[in-house]
Amino acid sequence: MAVKVAINGFGRIGRLAARAILSRPDSGLELVTINDLGSVEGNAFLFKRDSAHGTYPGTVTTEGNDMVIDGKKIVVTAERDPANLPHKKLGVDIVMECTGIFTNTEKASAHLTAGAKKVLISAPAKGDVDRTVVYGVNHKDLTADDKIVSNASCTTNCLAPVLHVLQQKIGIVRGLMTTVHSFTNDQRILDQIHSDLRRARTASASMIPTSTGAARAVALVIPELKGKLDGISIRVPTPDVSLVDFTFVPQRDTTAEEINSVLKAAADTGDMTGVLGYTDEPLVSRDFYSDPHSSTVDSRETAVLEGKLARVVAWYDNEWGFSNRMVDTAAQMAKTL
């Protein structure tokens, strides 16, 4: 029997998580309802026509206040308080919480009050939740007691699989990350006030340094790296696809060849298959649009100085890769119902 999923918040990640569910019937997930304050007509149109990922290949129509995708009716609501959503009536098992608002235990618990069994937050948690998961690294740690789970961030999902392999095979003393990140909705189209004055500037006109907790958050899934990592983000004028540039001190002398070898082996086998990618080609960001991997190692960029300072670069579609991990993590949570 399919696991029934609700999506709360139908923005970039909400819409793409819906696409990912619908494109992957093998996941065992069934999308039954969407909650968003926008009009059903507007949401249906934006779901069908995506500037980064193209037109949805199936049919998308509306029927009254609901959406019909590939002939299947999806109940649509516009409720501000998640506690009032019809989760119990619809038999919702897992909520994908994609608003960016209900990101702690207290707020996300409203979905449990409404009758859902578990909640997967599409963002780093603000405060304690039952578990933060990066699929491919610690997803097998999920238990029946994990009711409210964070899927971390797109950047943590890119970085953590790479670091997981490096920590196991070589060891990491300390490291710094820079993510060269496409602009997001948390920036301004034209100069306008923002709590971060750099993000207040026109997103399409500048490279914009800003903060990120993605590197530090890796410690939530790889505890032995706590306090050993930090990083920054540089937002750039592209609508999708980002890269992580990670420099680290290895625990022992290493070479670029060894680093590439262990990362390629991990990409080809085991839990990292489909999560971690690897390429020898001279690719650019446009080549990674709609790539479902969490991260793809660019072997041409791997470098080591005197065996004691190393650099690894990995690409990621910060929208589609992350949305696919939402599906994977939800499917893993379903096994604990």
From Swiss-Prot:
**Signal peptide residue numbers:** none
Presence of the UniProt keyword Repeat in the record: no
Reactions this protein catalyses: D-glyceraldehyde 3-phosphate + phosphate + NAD(+) = (2R)-3-phospho-glyceroyl phosphate + NADH + H(+)
Q: Does the keyword Cell division apply?
A: no
Quote the Gene3D superfamilies the UniProt record gives. Answer: Dihydrodipicolinate Reductase, domain 2, NAD(P)-binding Rossmann-like Domain
The entry's NAD(+)-binding residues are R12, I13, D36, R80, S122, N185, N318
Q: Where is this protein primarily located?
A: cytoplasm
Concerning its family, UniProt says:
Belongs to the glyceraldehyde-3-phosphate dehydrogenase family.
Could you give the subunit structure recorded for this chain? Homotetramer.
Full protein name? Glyceraldehyde-3-phosphate dehydrogenase
